């Protein structure tokens, strides 16, 4: 058995199967195409549509090294030898081509010949009823019967779900202790055995009754964990000490000033967590995920926060994730070049997220420590495990942004549980409070609709083809309650048999318009969808509307056209962002209204003015190119196969509506759109801003709304011209002159402040005291900003020649600024300004640091300032008089 690097193991696997006629395919993204799946959790996931018969295979045989990420066992990461979040799954796949005989024979050849594993260390399992696989292993491969175990359905039978393709599995295990013999072997003993290779034989189809029948086209799906194979071939005790992860662990240990091999168990666990999670966050960001509070973004945020938390447990202060990520990038770049291409994005996202979390962590840890203190004292007095109240955990989360998972982790370290049920109840109460005000009418309407029971049939929506139609009123609600009649002046909700009105969904607001009968006119100002019913919100303007009336339903054509322009422009905006900024950008929310559009998307940084202009220019170019739009109804699997963009978290039926702008954009969309991009006319970006961590927002206008916007801007320019008595082209110069005058006055004011600070500083010089062979000056200054503090320290140190200066100021009631400066000879005698100011800041409830000769810090407890300055005096005296 020859030791191989992780890269060599991966390449040998791919080369072996390529020689067996397999096409080597690149790893799919960690963001799967399937909008119902959060992350790519298995090597077979990219091929799932093929295995389910939804897509035809492009090749009969394939082999991959697939990036995967799972968080279901995140608490076990670092605590066991083999649990990971991020891992690589090596696999070979057959789509109706070869089957069990070849799959088993090749797997054995790979393990024993290519990787050189001793046959006497290998055992296999088969499904208890799979005689065919058993015979292949025994008779064709020649494996002794005592090395083949039949196992039950729970461990050795794979299903895609309640129905669909399924089949038995066969697994290859490595024995770390063959000297123990084969009597009473338990393959689940992970201290002795490690599962290396899993072969799935998809040969059956399961119906909704649980009956299984043979498949015509039988498939092979296999998986080998790269990290596990590396552990075996590199002869290390766990996956973390392989060359795939250990360099990250070593980098973290070096930052902490410790040696991994000499560290205790809890320290090693923290280092393993850091190593594992760092790989995960690098690949998540490289594949387009940004930190947020939902979905994949929350997975990323949680992993980053766990890295920071475990780094703090090791005593690592300051930013840590960018440095560790650089190690992970260097390890992966040769195989996954996108981590190098997106290196700047990865490091920037990690720095931003870590800096944000450190603010949360400091405050949250202090509050949590106060909450846990009485529980720790009571722990020995109670037989049951003490629990932190869920309401307290909720306060930490809701008020201070401290994650529940982190509260649980810190509490568990001290043997304390958390009442998660109460926490969830508090969350539910908060959601109800926040939604109650604007949901009252909707809830009442929903109750009114429910009370009508089966009297109502789903509304026929015909608004794609018809803008007006004659239909029947099937229900009327007044104040949310069913009614038979509504008279003039009454606010109503009307349900029709059929409607041309679009109901609000997918970010697009509902149509406006009117209903007219021989006796009534109803103005419709909103349309909402309740279950399968379209509820038209309006007001009876004249006459009397009755259930059973025949009415003419007419949408407001002007409003519909404005909405259509904004909706198609939204699709163009997403296409432009993907083309010009990052192909991994995806929608996080949207609003399509009559007067504007709003588009939220994942992006770790603000867009520049130049980028926004490029986006605007690209969209207007597409508009002027007069692209015809096409809508299609097709199967969801077909739409995904064609590359249509779906929004994660949306639930889609088997049949979906697709808007295609050939060569520009293809998205799943149920909204209304222009027939040709030229109908949009013009597109204008109004603003770009951040709405949450990792989420940016663009607000824009299109079509007639641009005309309104330009008229308004023209009015503003005319008003400025009148005020400045200037022509439009002269206004900027006038404003620049005003700014220059203001800047000159501010500069003069700063000069006066500096002179005042210098006068105060000169008076301080007399307070310097001799300590050892140097002078020490410790003082507090009033009315001086940090820059003034720095200027004063430099002047004083220059006058002292040899010595140390410690200055403090209190710029606000709850704020302290501290500064330590030292001459070079004093530094050589052992004074370190950065370490000293950190100690002083800690006394004042803050933090900071810096160079040996100069450092600044801040604190939040001015009452402790005198104590901090006394500490400075004693520390300097101790060093300089020794």
Curated annotation (Swiss-Prot):
Pfam families attached to this UniProt entry: DHHA1, tRNA-synt_2c, tRNA_SAD
Task: From the record, give the transmembrane residue ranges.
Answer: none
Q: What is its main location?
A: cytoplasm
Q: Which family does it belong to?
A: Belongs to the class-II aminoacyl-tRNA synthetase family.
Q: Which CDD domains match?
A: AlaRS_core
- UniProt entry keywords in alphabetical sequence: Aminoacyl-tRNA synthetase, ATP-binding, Cytoplasm, Ligase, Metal-binding, Nucleotide-binding, Protein biosynthesis, RNA-binding, tRNA-binding, Zinc
What the protein does comes down to: Catalyzes the attachment of alanine to tRNA(Ala) in a two-step reaction: alanine is first activated by ATP to form Ala-AMP and then transferred to the acceptor end of tRNA(Ala). Also edits incorrectly charged Ser-tRNA(Ala) and Gly-tRNA(Ala) via its editing domain.
Q: Where in the cell is it found?
A: Cytoplasm
Per its UniProt record, the required cofactor names are: Zn(2+)
HAMAP family given in the database record: Ala_tRNA_synth_B
One record GO biological process: alanyl-tRNA aminoacylation
Q: Which reaction does it catalyse?
A: tRNA(Ala) + L-alanine + ATP = L-alanyl-tRNA(Ala) + AMP + diphosphate
**Cofactor binding mode and count:** Binds 1 zinc ion per subunit.
Domain comment as written in the entry: Consists of three domains; the N-terminal catalytic domain, the editing domain and the C-terminal C-Ala domain. The editing domain removes incorrectly charged amino acids, while the C-Ala domain, along with tRNA(Ala), serves as a bridge to cooperatively bring together the editing and aminoacylation centers thus stimulating deacylation of misacylated tRNAs.
For the keyword RNA-binding, the answer is: yes
Lineage: superkingdom: Bacteria
Q: Which GO terms describe its molecular function?
A: alanine-tRNA ligase activity; aminoacyl-tRNA deacylase activity; ATP binding; tRNA binding; zinc ion binding
- Chloroplast listed as a keyword: no
Q: Which SUPFAM superfamilies match?
A: Class II aaRS and biotin synthetases, Putative anticodon-binding domain of alanyl-tRNA synthetase (AlaRS), ThrRS/AlaRS common domain, Translation proteins
Q: What is this protein called?
A: Alanine--tRNA ligase
Which Enzyme Commission number(s) are listed?
Answer: 6.1.1.7
* Residues that coordinate or bind Zn(2+): 567, 571, 669, 673
């Amino acid at each position: 058995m020859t030791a191989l690097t992780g890269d060599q193991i991966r390449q040998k696997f791919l080369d072996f199967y390529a020689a067996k006629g397999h096409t080597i395919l690149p790893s799919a993204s960690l963001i799967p195409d399937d909008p119902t799946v959060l992350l790519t959790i298995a090597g077979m996931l990219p091929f799932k549509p093929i295995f389910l018969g939804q897509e035809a295979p492009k090749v009969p045989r394939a082999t991959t090294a697939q990036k995967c990420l799972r968080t279901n066992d995140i608490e076990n990461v670092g605590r066991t030898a083999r649990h990971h979040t991020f891992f690589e799954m090596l696999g070979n796949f057959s789509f109706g081509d070869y089957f069990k005989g070849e799959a088993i024979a090749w797997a054995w050849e790979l393990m024993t010949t290519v990787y050189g594993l001793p046959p006497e260390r290998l055992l296999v399992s088969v499904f208890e009823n799979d005689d065919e696989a058993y015979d292949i292993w025994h008779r064709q491969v020649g494996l002794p019967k005592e090395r083949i175990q039949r196992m039950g359905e729970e461990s050795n039978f794979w299903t895609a779900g309640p129905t669909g393709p399924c089949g038995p599995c066969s697994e290859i295990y490595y024995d770390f202790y063959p000297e123990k013999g084969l009597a009473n072997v338990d393959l689940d003993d992970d201290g002795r055995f490690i599962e290396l290779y899993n072969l799935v034989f998809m040969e059956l189809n399961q119906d909704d009754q649980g009956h299984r029948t043979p498949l015509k086209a039988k498939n092979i799906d296999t998986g080998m964990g790269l990290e596990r194979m590396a552990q075996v071939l590199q002869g290390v005790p766990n996956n973390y000490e392989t060359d795939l992860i250990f360099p990250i662990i070593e980098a973290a240990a070096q930052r902490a000033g410790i040696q991994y091999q000499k560290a205790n168990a809890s320290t090693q666990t923290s280092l393993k967590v850091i190593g594992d999670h760092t790989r995960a966050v690098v690949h998540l960001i490289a594949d387009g995920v940004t930190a947020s509070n939902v979905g994949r973004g929350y997975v990323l945020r949680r992993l980053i926060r766990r890295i920071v938390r475990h780094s703090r447990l090791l005593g690592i202060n300051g930013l840590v994730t960018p440095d560790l990520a650089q190690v992970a990038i260097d390890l992966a770049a040769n195989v996954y070049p996108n981590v190098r291409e997106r290196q700047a994005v990865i490091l920037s996202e990690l720095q931003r997220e870590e800096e944000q979390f450190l603010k949360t962590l400091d405050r949250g840890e202090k509050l949590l420590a106060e909450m846990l203190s009485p529980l720790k004292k009571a722990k020995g007095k109670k037989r049951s495990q003490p629990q932190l109240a869920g309401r307290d955990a909720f306060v930490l989360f809701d008020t201070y942004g401290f994650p529940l998972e982190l509260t649980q982790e810190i509490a568990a370290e001290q043997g304390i549980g958390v009442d998660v049920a109460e926490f969830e109840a508090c969350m539910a109460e908060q959601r109800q409070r926040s939604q109650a005000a604007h949901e009252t009418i909707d809830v009442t309407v929903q109750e009114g609709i429910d009370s009508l029971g089966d009297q109502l049939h789903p509304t026929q929506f015909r608004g794609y083809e018809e803008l007006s139609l004659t239909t029947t009123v099937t229900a009327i609600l007044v104040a949310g309650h069913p009614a038979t009649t509504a008279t003039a002046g009454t606010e109503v909700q009307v349900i029709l048999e059929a409607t041309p009105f679009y109901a609000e969904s997918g970010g697009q607001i509902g149509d406006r318009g009117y209903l007219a009968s021989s006796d009534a006119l109803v103005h419709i100002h909103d349309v909402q969808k309740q279950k399968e019913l379209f509820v038209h919100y309006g007001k009876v303007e004249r006459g009397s509307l009755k259930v059973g009336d025949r009415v003419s339903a007419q949408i407001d054509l002007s409003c519909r056209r404005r909405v259509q322009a904004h909706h198609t422009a939204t699709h163009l905006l997403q296409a432009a962002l993907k083309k010009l900024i990052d192909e991994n950008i995806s929608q996080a929310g949207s609003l399509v209204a009559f007067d504007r559009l709003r588009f939220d998307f994942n992006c770790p940084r603000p867009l520049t003015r130049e980028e926004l202009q490029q986006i605007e220019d690209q969209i207007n170019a597409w508009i002027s190119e007069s692209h015809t739009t096409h809508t299609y109804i097709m199967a969801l699997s077909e739409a995904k196969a064609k590359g249509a963009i779906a929004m994660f978290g949306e639930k889609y039926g088997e049949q979906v509506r697709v808007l295609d702008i050939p060569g520009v954009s293809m998205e799943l969309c149920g909204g209304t759109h222009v027939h040709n991009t030229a109908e949009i006319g013009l597109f204008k970006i109004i603003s770009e801003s951040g709405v949450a961590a990792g989420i940016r927002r663009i607000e824009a206008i299109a079509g007639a709304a641009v005309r309104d916007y330009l008229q308004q801007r023209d009015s503003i320019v005319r008003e400025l011209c009148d005020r400045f008595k200037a022509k439009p082209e002269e206004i900027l110069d006038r404003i620049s002159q005003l700014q220059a005058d203001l800047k000159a006055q501010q500069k003069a004011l700063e000069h006066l402040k500096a002179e005042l600070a210098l006068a105060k500083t000169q008076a301080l010089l007399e307070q310097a005291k001799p300590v050892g062979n140097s002078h020490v000056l410790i003082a507090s200054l009033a009315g001086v900003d940090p820059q003034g503090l720095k200027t004063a320290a430099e002047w004083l140190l220059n006058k002292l020649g040899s010595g140390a200066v410690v200055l403090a100021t209190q710029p606000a009631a709850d704020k302290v600024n501290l500064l330590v400066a030292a001459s070079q000879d004093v530094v050589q005698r052992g004074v370190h300004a950065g370490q000293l100011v950190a100690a002083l800041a800690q006394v004042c409830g803050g933090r900071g640091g810096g160079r040996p000769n100069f450092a600044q810090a801040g604190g939040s407890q001015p009452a402790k300032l005198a104590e901090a300055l006394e500490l400075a005096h004693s520390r300097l005296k101790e060093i300089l008089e020794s």
